[in-house]
Design a protein with these regions (language model features):
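A short glycine-rich, His/Asp/Glu-containing loop-to-beta-strand
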Residues: 1-22
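A generic "binding-loop/recognition-motif" signal
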Residues: 11, 20, 30, 49, ...
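Short, surface-exposed secondary-structure edge patches
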Residues: 15, 34, 49-52
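Short, conserved beta-strand element in jelly-roll/cupin
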Residues: 17-19, 30-44
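A cytosolic small-molecule/anion-sensing beta-strand core signal
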Residues: 38-39, 54-55, 73
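Short acidic-glycine-tyrosine-enriched beta hairpin
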Residues: 48-63
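Ligand-binding loop in jelly-roll beta-barrel domains
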Residues: 63-83
């Protein structure tokens, strides 16, 4: 589930909720993406390297680098992309 909270040519803010085992497959974005885990545990893979993200933790996914998101359990995250 995702809900776009704000979007324009320079910025996108989206709330995501994943069930356990749900994922967004590997892709690239034209903007730098800042992810904050709001609840649960997720795995963010950037350039093939996995990072486990817990509630309150954040990570940056650089523009034009392949990345993916996986819900290791129910997982909520806020995604802010700056173009």
């Amino acid at each position: 589930m995702s809900k776009t909270l704000a979007q324009n040519d320079a910025l996108s803010v989206t709330l995501f909720a994943f069930d356990k085992g749900e994922e967004i497959s590997t892709h690239e974005s034209g903007g730098d993406a800042f992810v904050t885990c709001l609840d649960g545990t997720g795995r963010i893979t950037i350039d093939g390297v996995p990072y486990e993200l817990h509630e309150g933790e954040s990570i940056v996914m650089p523009a034009r680098h392949p990345h993916a998101v996986y819900g290791q359990e129910q997982f909520k995250m806020l995604l802010v992309v700056v173009f």
